[in-house]
């Protein structure tokens, strides 16, 4: 106010996906949560649920997500595939974009040039393919810095890690299937 006092006080929580809720909304969401078939609050509990029910982590997470969302497992897989597509698109944009990042610090994008160097080396000598995930992560982080569309998983600051591993898996593993991609993301979601 005019005397320098508080006008209003409110607690907000970041609940992921770029969304925030008030403390009242957060409490209401907790009350409205649907029961899940494989509840857990720690990694040890998740692993125990998987052992007890003879499930992979991705299977337990898939069943829980379907229960929470009130939809089929096929619908959850469709949504997870959509997340994978957003991650792939982010890497492709990051590898194609050139120039300076916004913000006035005159920081140039490096991912496209590093990718070009790796491609050139590949034709002339053995390349350590483990360098590719670093380039993919950098492409995502540069897209993030440029205000591009990223998936904030596990956090916005680490948004390049999961897409980089996913893209590397798809590109370099001959056994990569859509189901394995989805299982990877479901498992990564459980780990957070």
What role is predicted for each listed range?
Residues 70-192:
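Accessory "access/gating" subregions that flank catalytic or transport cores
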Residues 1-121:
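C-terminal regulatory domains involved in ligand/effector binding and gene-expression control
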